[in-house]
Amino acid sequence: SFFQSLEMGELLTKRGYDVRFVGYRDSSSTIVISSLVFCKKMFGGLYMELNSGPVVSDNSYLEKFFQSLRDYAKHEGVLELVVKPSQTYQTFDSNGQPLGFEDTHLIEMLTKNDFQYDGLQTGYPNGEPVWHYVKDLEGITEDTLVSSFSKKGKVLSKKANSFGLNITRLTKDELPRFKAITEATSNRRDYTDKPLDYYQDLFDTFSDGADFLIASLNLTTYLDLLHSQEDKLKKIAENLVQDLSINPKSRKKGNELREIESQIESFEQRKQNAEQWINKYGTSDIDIAASLFIYTKQELVYLFSGSLEEFSSFYAPII
């Protein structure tokens, strides 16, 4: 996990945490388990946390590692040691159906060694997810990515890419644009957003290993696009009307015409919305969605994101 990286250690240090790297050696002094842990002061002692770890090359030493970590924490005056393991508890498909049984081995081992299990959580506790959606990217290229989506994902991707949205990689000075989106989202969904200086520190620490992306919309360009697309539909409708005048009993042509007329009607509504937004926001570009990606050798992490509910019909997060 990126959370066990040197960059994350540097970021946590910038944020005022006491960062430590701990490990366990086998009988030949080979490091078989290692982890980043971080501490902060609490009343009467220290709080210590191991998040998304440890990094393991030999699982047979896991119990000894956690026993040693527990003893080390006691020696350092830690009052609360929190472990958030990276091991998978259970795997589900995209519909939420389990693909296997719960793996309770780690929980049983930790509780046997005086740790208390807090149970499975939902939502966004402390601003971080405990449920992860994982997609295997092996063999997938930029050209084949969309074809790997679900049927719904393909439809939404096609729609999102038809609106003329612009994707921009932000500089550090532009991060307030990112913060404005994530803050609006956190207020709407009732969780605590990170402060702006956290995102700035992350930008500095991860450098090219992080992308802060913004999806923006130019309403004037969007309105022109709607006019152009509607004109094409009207020409198709005119041809269908002409075909039906020759063969009025053609069920196929009749169905096609009804579908095209329905699309034209939806374009009229979209144009009205666009004109209302122009009156409200003017003709400058509007930021409607934001996302932060972290890159490591093992994974690409879609870490933080947000979008404006008013523009949800553009499906900007998908692109």
Task: Label each residue range with its predicted role.
Residues 1-44, 90, 115-126, 134-313:
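A conserved beta-strand-loop-helix scaffold within acyl/acetyltransferase catalytic domains
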Residues 45-128, 262, 283, 288, ...:
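Acyl-donor binding region in acyl/amide transferases
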